[in-house]
Amino acid sequence: MIILIDSGNSRLKVGWFDPDAPQAAREPAPVAFDNLDLDALGRWLATLPRRPQRALGVNVAGLARGQAIAATLRAGGCDIRWLRAQPLAMGLRNGYRNPDQLGADRWACMVGVLARQPSVHPPLLVASFGTATTLDTIGPDNVFPGGLILPGPAMMRGALAHGTAHLPLADGLVADYPIDTHQAIASGIAAAQAGAIVRQWLAGRQRYGQAPEIYVAGGGWPEVRQEAERLLAVTGAAFGATPRPTYLDSPVLDGLAALAAHGAPTA
């Protein structure tokens, strides 16, 4: 059994992959903890049906957090290997000028999405809504040409509340023409997030001559889903397309499992 670790800025998401089980079994459902609650990680390890042999993970929460997670795993008899983005792995070719500068979580997420695809597939747009929102494209040739990073919905809301004198930590409904401050902030955040998806969908369509399939993930997606789907529908209609995002619960863990299963480069 191999433990899979996605250490994000806010949450620690964990699962497992068992290459020795029939059909290379996965966890029934991934589990998420606050990234500061390593006691919860230790308790989860104690519930596993088999003692893990090792762990594979990606960590964007800093060196100290990675060391603390590694210590918790070691206490359970399991060493972890933290992965970094590679120039080429599982067919995904990394187009970053410096390939290892690409966030390991973004890379593993794209690997996970690509692992779901047949050999011939359309362009793919992978949007993850966490502390930061990232939007990454994979071409039909399996090349990642680049992507966007912007503040996630919660960070946008917090920045307005803490960086200004009078704006609240907003909790309002999204509207075309907001009529109070809470609505105005909520609508602005949803518009920014949805607009980024539409921008990259249009860019992919122009670059590849066909509409990208959209995959979404992350805890911030429910907040922006309605506005994103509305703008995508309006935009797609102009091209005779109906873009419908597919939600994935744990594409980073899926990518780690694929890398573990196929022995792909992970140094």
Curated annotation (Swiss-Prot):
Which BP terms does GO give this entry?
coenzyme A biosynthetic process
Gene Ontology molecular function, alphabetical? ATP binding; pantothenate kinase activity
In short, the EC number is 2.7.1.33
Q: Where in the cell is it found?
A: Cytoplasm
Which residues of the sequence carry a binding annotation for ATP?
D6, S7, G8, N9, S10, R11, L12, K13, T131
Say which enzyme class the record assigns: transferase
A Pfam match is Pan_kinase
Q: According to its UniProt record, in which pathway does this protein act? A: Cofactor biosynthesis; coenzyme A biosynthesis; CoA from (R)-pantothenate: step 1/5
In this protein, the active site sits at D105
Tell me the residue numbers annotated for binding substrate. Y96, G103, A104, D105, R106, T181
Q: Which reaction does it catalyse?
A: (R)-pantothenate + ATP = (R)-4'-phosphopantothenate + ADP + H(+)
Q: Which metal ions or organic cofactors does this protein require, according to UniProt?
A: NH4(+); K(+)
| UniProt-listed InterPro entries | ATPase_NBD, Type_III_PanK
Q: What does this protein do?
A: Catalyzes the phosphorylation of pantothenate (Pan), the first step in CoA biosynthesis.
- Fill in the subunit field for this protein: Homodimer.
Q: Which family does it belong to?
A: Belongs to the type III pantothenate kinase family.
What name appears for this protein in its UniProt entry? Type III pantothenate kinase
Gene name for this UniProt entry:
coaX
